[in-house]
């Protein structure tokens, strides 16, 4: 008997921090455990999705998942290396909101356009590749039409041979469900 949840924000030992929605160290797991008899497992949404995607494929040992939920929003990254989910200290691995990335001067004007989405996605894919060098980066961004566009932009900054496979996906639900189940079962 288990309830497995997938939420945005930093999730560490059942405590959720998502400041833009007013959650600052919310003890959600303890609160839910008082109300329900089932074991409660809470994970970050991007980590849940990357786990589900990884489990549904056999081609890659190492993947990263770049997620921009809201057009023009900050997003997040999930990493799996050789089957291991990388959460980092205090589970903040992938919290790209803390990266000091510089964008073009007119980025605030274009961030909700395909041009702005391409700049955002390219810069974070370059960062992921430089730091983690996964076999593939899975991209979820509604304004990116083709992953090839991102690859062409990345080639302006790094050798083509360094660029991982880039895979754009359109739907998250199945990967989130698989990830919730797998991460929940790990805690049983």
Language model regions located:
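Conserved residues at the C-terminal ends of beta-strands
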Residues: 6, 66, 140
């Amino acid at each position: 008997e288990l309830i497995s949840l997938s939420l945005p924000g930093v999730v560490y030992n059942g405590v959720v921090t998502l400041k833009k929605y007013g959650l600052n160290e919310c003890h959600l797991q303890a609160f839910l455990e008082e109300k329900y008899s089932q074991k409660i497992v809470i994970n970050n949404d991007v980590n849940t999705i990357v786990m589900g995607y990884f489990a549904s494929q056999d081609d890659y040992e190492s993947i990263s998942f770049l997620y921009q939920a809201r057009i023009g929003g900050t997003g997040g990254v999930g990493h799996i290396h050789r089957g291991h989910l990388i959460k980092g200290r205090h589970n903040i691995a992938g919290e790209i909101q803390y990266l000091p990335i510089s964008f073009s001067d007119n980025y605030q004007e274009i961030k909700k356009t395909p041009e702005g989405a391409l700049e955002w996605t390219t810069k974070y894919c370059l960062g992921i590749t430089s730091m983690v060098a996964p076999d593939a980066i899975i991209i979820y961004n509604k304004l990116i039409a083709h992953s090839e566009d991102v690859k062409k932009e990345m080639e302006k900054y790094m050798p083509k041979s360094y660029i991982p496979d880039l895979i754009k996906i359109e739907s998250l639900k199945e990967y989130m469900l698989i990830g919730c189940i797998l991460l929940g079962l790990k805690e049983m």
